[in-house]
UniProtKB/Swiss-Prot annotation:
Its main location: cytoplasm. SUPFAM superfamilies: Dehydroquinate synthase-like. It comes from the Bacteria. It comes from Prochlorococcus marinus (strain MIT 9313). The gene is aroB. Pfam families: DHQ_synthase, DHQS_C. This is 3-dehydroquinate synthase. Disulfide bonds: none annotated.
Length: 372
């Protein structure tokens, strides 16, 4: 057995033809990141730029750096601001500046240690530095663990919309240390639970039922470690299966945008940073659930089950007061628009969805009227 194999970790393959990688859950966690990088084929002696934010770097930065040094890497730590309002080209330029100062080469590595914003910006910086260097994702929020860190989507926001500037850039490794959730603010944990619920709706009715059976969903301290790891594993497996079959969102991967079309409108019109991404997605899922009822795609009972589970997770379910015409205008600028037509992921039952390009503006107006 290889000296770099961690027998206690759960390993989920992301089976891409050109660059397969693993999502590793548990094991030694951040203490074993250096070993896991060696196992993934990264050579000792290479320069590593670890990008993090202050709230994460304080408890975990030194631990990560020590593990990297013990495995023969040469790490440097960069601490950045990581609110959604900081997810801009200017912030990525700061990472580029640090890469220049650290003299990163094409064989060097960037490591994202933090939540989804850190992961998105670091991934995009890696994709664009020297026309692309390797990146590793070390997610420390629930949302990043189950969604943002897996699949290679990177990017930053534009005043006209969320994630309009970006690239697909797959990581060499995703390492999930569930113990980092102990220091995660409860609001952030709840936001991540929105993405977990999403997986239940789009393709895993058993996961949805599992979540329905849990009495307390809104804080990690209420979940037994084994149950938490099961939720992480099922969610990561759901994401990896979709990404493995459709890396660049040519077809099936679009189902991962469930709740995001309306959710991105909420983020854009309410201002980045006023809602956490997962909170906006939760509102978006409730909204598209109502749209599905109006289209008779699924039952009112299914819509109510979804809304109840979202509420139990401590997430918002009320649509904010927004001008319907502004909503329609913002939807038209969404990157998921195809041939000028609005594209939505519509649920047809718990565990099943369809991608629809025929949603009319009048249907959206009626849906917004029902929500308000």
């Amino acid at each position: 057995m290889s000296a770099f194999v961690n027998i206690d970790a759960q390993r989920i393959p992301v089976a891409l033809s050109h660059q397969p990688y693993e999502v590793v859950i548990g094991g030694e966690g951040l203490r074993g990141v250096g070993k896991e990088l060696r196992r993934a084929g990264l050579k000792e002696g290479i320069k590593v730029l670890v990008v993090s934010n202050a709230d994460v770097a304080e408890p975990y930065g030194d631990l990560c750096l020590q593990s990297l040094k013990e495995s023969g890497f040469r790490p440097t730590l960069l601490v950045i601001e990581a609110g959604e309002d900081q997810k801009t080209p200017v912030s990525v330029a700061l990472i580029h500046d640090a890469a220049y100062e650290a003299k990163l080469e094409r064989g060097s590595l960037m490591v994202a240690l933090g939540g989804g914003v850190v992961g998105d910006m670091t991934g995009f910086a890696a994709a664009t530095w020297l026309r692309g260097i390797s990146v590793v994702q070390l997610p420390t929020t629930l949302l990043a663990m189950v969604d943002a860190a897996i699949g290679g989507k990177t990017g930053v926001n534009h005043p006209g919309g969320k994630n309009l500037i970006g690239a697909f850039h797959q990581p060499r490794l995703v390492l999930i240390d569930p113990s980092t959730l102990k220091t995660l603010p409860e609001r952030e944990f709840r936001a991540g639970m929105a993405e977990v619920i999403k997986y239940g709706v789009i393709g895993d009715s058993a996961l949805f039922q599992l979540l329905e059976g849990i009495q307390e969903l809104d804080t990690p301290s209420q979940l037994h470690q084994d149950l938490l790891e099961k939720i992480l594993e099922r969610s990561a497996l759901a994401k990896s299966r979709v990404v493995s079959s459709d890396e660049r969102e040519g077809g099936l991967r679009a189902i991962l945008n469930y709740g995001h079309t309306f959710g991105h409108v909420v983020e854009t019109l309410c201002g980045y940073g006023n809602w956490l991404h997962g909170e906006a997605v939760a509102i978006g899922m409730v909204a598209v659930g109502e749209l599905a009822v109006l289209r008779q795609s699924w039952s009112r009972d299914d819509a109510n089950r979804q809304k109840s589970l979202i509420a139990k997770a401590g997430l918002p379910i009320a649509w904010p007061k927004l001008d319907p015409e502004e909503v329609l205008y913002t939807l038209q600028g969404d990157k998921k628009v195809k041939d000028g037509k609005l594209r939505f992921v519509i649920p047809t039952g718990i565990g099943n969805v369809e991608i629809k390009n025929d949603v009319s503006r009048e249907e959206i107006r009626k849906c917004l009227s029902e929500l308000s």
